[in-house]
UniProtKB/Swiss-Prot annotation:
Domain of life: Bacteria
Species for this entry: Pediococcus pentosaceus (strain ATCC 25745 / CCUG 21536 / LMG 10740 / 183-1w)
Quaternary assembly: Homodimer.
Catalytic residues as annotated in Swiss-Prot or TrEMBL: 52, 124
Gene, per the UniProt record: rnc
Phylogenetic lineage: Bacteria, Bacillati, Bacillota, Bacilli, Lactobacillales
PROSITE patterns associated with the record: DS_RBD, RNASE_3_2
Spans traversing the lipid bilayer: none
A biological process term (GO) from this entry: tRNA processing
This protein's name: Ribonuclease 3
């Protein structure tokens, strides 16, 4: 099972572990260890502890740099949404990690392999193992593939919502007409890039791009916010 995981990591992410025991530990649950007492196995909880801390730091730094104007409270809410159980569980399934967990027979029968809390733990423990094996740079490369693109895909728009923020800023002194207009669609049909402009009382403020009109509108609003908040 671990050999299949190594092949998957190699083909999908170009990740090659040096210390294979770390990968074994990261994907082994306590129930499996208890059923194999003579194999001197370790389970994932200690590595998970480390992975959680590494993810918190890397995601925090990324958000801090990506959104230089975002208030601390909103940064905290956005980070909480990105590093929560539901998000990590989704990321684990996207990476096929659920296929490679070593479980005891009882846990397997109970459906633990698809349990959100376990998948979250496994994602964190994998990050911990990758950090121990190859350092922070390797973890950053991985999360730039798996986690950060979700921001551009609109997964966390319910927290960011630059459009509402822009509306509040522009209309604090009276009514302002804000419009979003599709400027262009470029690229192949299965990978379109949309460009949207945002105007206030028919005056163009900024443009934004994204893989959907919704995301492009949010990015246009974010660009407008940054321009409006710059010191004059």
């Amino acid at each position: 099972m671990i050999k299949a995981l190594e092949d998957d990591l190699s083909q999908t992410f170009d990740i090659h572990f040096n210390n294979h025991a770390l990968l074994d530990e990261a994907f082994t649950q306590a129930s499996y260890v208890n059923e194999h007492p003579h194999q001197e196995l370790k389970f994932y909880e200690r590595i998970e502890f480390l992975g959680d801390a590494v993810l918190q730091l890397i995601v925090s730094e990324y958000l801090f740099k990506r959104y230089p104007e975002m208030p601390q409270g909103k940064l905290t809410r956005l980070r909480a949404a990105m590093v929560c159980e539901a998000s990590f569980s989704d990321f684990a399934k996207e990476c096929h990690f659920d296929q490679y967990i070593r479980l005891g027979k009882g846990e397997e029968k109970s459906g633990a392999r698809q349990r959100s809390s376990l998948l979250c733990d496994i994602f964190e423990s994998f990050i911990g193992a990758l950090y121990l094996d190859q350092g922070r740079a390797a973890v950053e490369r991985f999360v730039r593939i798996v986690i950060f693109p979700k921001l551009d895909e609109g997964k966390f728009d319910h927290i960011i919502d630059h459009k509402s923020e822009l509306q509040e800023l522009l209309q604090k002194n009276g009514d302002v007409e804000i419009d979003y207009e599709l400027v262009s669609e470029e690229g192949p049909e299965n990978d379109l890039i949309f460009t949207v402009s945002v105007t206030a009382d028919h005056k163009k403020l900024a443009t934004g791009t994204g893989h959907s009109k919704k995301v492009a509108e949010q990015n246009a609003a974010n660009q407008a916010l940054q321009l409006l908040r710059r010191p004059k």
